[in-house]
Amino acid sequence: MAASLQAAATFMTPTSRVQLKSSPSICKAFGIESTGSKVSCSLQADLKDFAQKCTDAAKIAGFALATSALVVSGASAEGSPKRLTYDEIQSKTYMEVKGTGTANQCPTIEGGVNGFAVKPGKYNAQKFCLEPTSFTVKAEGISKNSAPEFQKTKLMTRLTYTLDEIEGPLEVSSDGTIKFEEKDGIDYAAVTVQLPGGERVPFLFTIKELVATGKPESFGGNFLVPSYRGSSFLDPKGRGGSTGYDNAVALPAGGRGDEEELLKENIKNTAAGKGEITFSVTSSKPETGEVIGVFESIQPSDTDLGAKAPKDVKIQGVWYAQLW
């Protein structure tokens, strides 16, 4: 019993000083100057100082982590860049535009009037730009037996989906009717979106060979939708429309009954589809010939060269043009 009490008393007796071996890296990290091979310090004071330094280091690390997270999320927090006028875009240098998203935006106008304030006559539409702001795909819902409807999608393509520099003749009749024919320009863009269930839908956003007619508040027409893949594209088995193998599938073990499915895979179909678009003029600036508005387009998606049934893709956005 006495031995136990003596041991407990010895353990509880405070130690005034201890000898600690010094390490150059530890001394440098915690601001302790080493003298010789040993350093003498008060146990309670140094432990308190050590704990304080650890707390400060944790605060600094936490602040650095939060700062880095803020920097990473800064682009999405700021949102889309401010929409600029055509002259403002032209006045910027390449480095001022690079990485800002401005190159993927259609210009806007300032000081214009509501509606289509353009005199009747024949014009040449230039700098025609179409910028999508929404992609929806008609597909069955996630729930069982749900009817097909247009569903919101997630864009999987980078900011390269805007059509620009499109041009063609535009005629304004005396009764206010508009007729526009697309002739040239960057009139197609490959886009891929993802449905809520995870399925990805590629399509070729385009207005090739568009002939649009109607009143300024609603004019539109049909256009050509080329095949997403060309005839020289080879699938993983080396089959193509104009090159590659004609047949790369062995006879099915079950005999007949799969000919139609095999035919779709073997014989590539690069036929073009048809789409429909409707424009609406929201504002115009007669002194500069600038016109802006909104549009809605419905077109088919990619068919994997005829192997899949196309889906309807609805594209909504804004447009800009100059009339000369």
Curated annotation (Swiss-Prot):
GO molecular function: oxygen evolving activity
GO annotation terms (biological process): photosystem II assembly; photosystem II stabilization
Induction cue: Down-regulated in response to mixed metal ion contamination (cadmium, copper, lead and zinc), but not in response to zinc ion contamination.
Pfam families reported in the protein's UniProt record: MSP (PF01716)
Organism domain of life: Eukaryota
Keywords: Chloroplast, Manganese, Membrane, Photosynthesis, Photosystem II, Plastid, Thylakoid, Transit peptide
InterPro entries assigned: OMP/PagP_b-brl, PsbO
Annotated Gene Ontology cellular component terms: chloroplast thylakoid membrane; photosystem II oxygen evolving complex
Record carries keyword 4Fe-4S: no
Cellular location(s): Plastid, Chloroplast thylakoid membrane
PANTHER family xrefs: OXYGEN-EVOLVING ENHANCER PROTEIN 1-2, CHLOROPLASTIC (PTHR34058)
Family, as annotated: Belongs to the PsbO family.
Record's function text: Stabilizes the manganese cluster which is the primary site of water splitting.
Name assigned to this protein: Oxygen-evolving enhancer protein 1, chloroplastic
Naturally occurring in which organism (per UniProt): Helianthus annuus (Common sunflower)
Gene: PSBO
